[in-house]
Amino acid sequence: MRRKFLCGLAAFAWAPGLWAQPVPARDLWEFPLGSVLEPAALASEPGGGLWNPATTLTSGTERWRLGVAALSSASDQSVDGQLIAATFRRTNGIAFGASIARSAVASILRTETDPQSLGEVPYSSLLMSITAARAIVPHVTAGVALRYREGHADQLVNHAFAADLGIIVHSLPVLDARIAVSSFLWRPGKEIDDRPAVLAAVDARLMGTTDRETRLGLSYNGVNRGAKELGPFVSWRFDRVDLRGAYLRTSASGRSVSRIRWGMALHYARYVVGFAREEGASELGPLYQFTLSSMLR
């Protein structure tokens, strides 16, 4: 079964039809939609494996996970995003996920020689993903994603498929450490046009147990020919409450900016509700996020 699963990963990665034309609005997927409590490479809320397909398989006992997420910025030229996701875990240990995400920028005004506005320029992107993940050896989970992306920029509309691979090494004997790496929006041969990203994170438990712990880690998100983000993060878990803070340094086009991201979540019965705020992302003002997920056995 493990051999079949690895063959499936390779088949997805080299599936025919991945060599479409460039798709506009790629930069909208540099905003961390749904990544409230953990960096993108480790983010398991609200499910579906949007950023790292290996997170489709969770460590819990639930068979179903349903979740939604929303992102918005408080500025005149605002960014907003929505995500709906579902995950199903089979009795043989393989988990499947599906998600639909949309991101857009509003209030881009169309002008000509006259400064008077001629209306708004549409700028948005839709991303649909199907993921699968399973444990391939003890402490190692691998996942694969097949994605369809559509982008709108004024009159230009285009779409393409992409395939991603992700892996998480977890529950290591030393400090319960975790290591996660994933590609994002990868199309072989189109690395310049599509600017795929590499997402990575590592963290370890400083003190406590599973339900009451403090973890410290380092995250990295790097877009090909685009922004590079690096910074430490810390998380606290105390029974039903999660708290997280991160200090991030982003470099792009010869400039660097530092910002703080913080979030919190409440675990109640089979529900998880999360909220996060990020300072000064992409010069669009603060970003606010909300997530809600439900786990069914």
Language-model features: locations:
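N-terminal, post-signal peptide beta-strand-biased segments of exported outer-membrane/organellar beta-barrel
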Residues: 18-92, 287, 292-295
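Bacterial N-terminal signal peptides
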Residues: 7-17
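Outer membrane beta-barrel transmembrane domains
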Residues: 46, 178-179, 190-297
